[in-house]
Amino acid sequence: MERPKDIWHFARPLLAKQYLGEFDLGLISARALFAKRRMGKSTLLERDLIPAAQQAGYITPYLNLWTATQTPAQALLRIISSAVAPKGWSKILKRLKGMKSVKTSAALKGIVEGKLEMEWEGLAATVATPLLGDLLNELPSRQRMLLVLDEAQVLARPEHSELAHSLRANLDSRKASIKVIFAGSSEVTLRQMFGRVQEPFYNWAPLTPFPLLGEEFVHALTQLVNRLSRYALTGRETLEAFEALGRTPEFFRLYLSRYLAYASEGSAAALAHTRAEVYNDTSLQRTWQSLPPLDRAVLQLIARGVTDVFSAAVRGQIGKGLGESAPSIGIVQKAVGRLTRGEILVRVERGEYHVQDDVFLEWLKRPT
C-alpha cells in the first residue's frame, strides 16, 4: 500500500539517486552516514531512498536499531524474513524444529502457526544469529537487496559483537547482490565501528556526514505556509527561526505548525512557543529523573564544560553536592559507563566526554 502523500515532506530525489548510483557503479557495496538526531536522516531513508531503490528493483528491508537495542539479531531476522518470504521459510522452520533449545519454545510455536513477523523476538540471540545466513541464502541470485540499518551504532555495543561479526561475514560473501546503508546519530561511535582494526566492520564502509537541510528546505516550506495562510511569513523570519532552532528540521516544522495555528500572533511568538516546547520536553525530564543521583551530578558537570570528572577536585565537588564523601575514581567511571551505554554521553577523547543530544545539553544548561 502506498504511503499517503505528505505535503510537508521536502523530497531529495537527487541525493537518493546519488547513493544508489554509487552502488550501481560497483565501487562500493555499503555506505555509512552520520548526523545528529532529528536532522532528517530517517526521513530521507524511508521517504526518498527506499522508494527509489524499490523502483530500481531492490527489495528493501529497513530496521531502526534504536527500536531493537536488546534484540537486534531477532529484529534483523524479522525484517529479512519478510523480504525473502515465503520462499525461505520452509528450510528455516525445518532447521528450527531440529534445535533442541527451541523445540518447545513459544517463539517456534508462533512461527509454525504463521505469526512469523511477531515471533522472531522470542528466539534467543544464539539461535537467531546463525539463522541470518540461512535466510540470506534463500535470496534469489538475481534479486538485489538494499539493507537499511538506521541508528547502526547499536551494533557497536559489546553485547552485540557476535551478531556484528556474523552479519559482516554474511554480507562479505554477498556484496554483488546486497548493498547496505548504515546510518547513525553517534559520529564517534560510528568512527570507532568502521575505523578500529579490532571492530567487525573495520574499513567495511566509507563513513561520511549526512548532507544537512538548509536554505532550500526553509524556502520551500515557507512558500507552502504562505499558500495556506493569509498571514505571510518572510524569508528572513523563517531563516532566523531555523537558525534559532539549531537548523533542526524537526523543530522547524513544529515552529511552522504553531505559526499556522496562531498566525495572527506572528513569527516571534511561534518561535518562542516552539523553543519553550522543545527545551522543556517532558521526555527530557523523564530521562533526568530516571538517572541515579551520582549520574545526574556527573552529567551536569560535563554539560557545563567540566572535562576531568575523575580528578580529586571534581570528585570532591560531586561528593559535596550529594552530601557524601568524594566518590572514588572507579565509582565515577561506572557512572560515566552507564551514561555512555545509554547514549547520553559520548566519548570524544580518552577521558573526555560530551552530551550527545544537543537538545538535552541545552536543557541541562538552563538556569534552575
What do the predicted segments below correspond to?
Residues 282-368:
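C-terminal leucine-rich, beta-strand-based interaction scaffolds used for sensing/assembly
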Residues 7-20:
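N-terminal pre-P-loop "Q-motif" helix
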Residues 118-186, 195:
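Conserved Walker B catalytic segment
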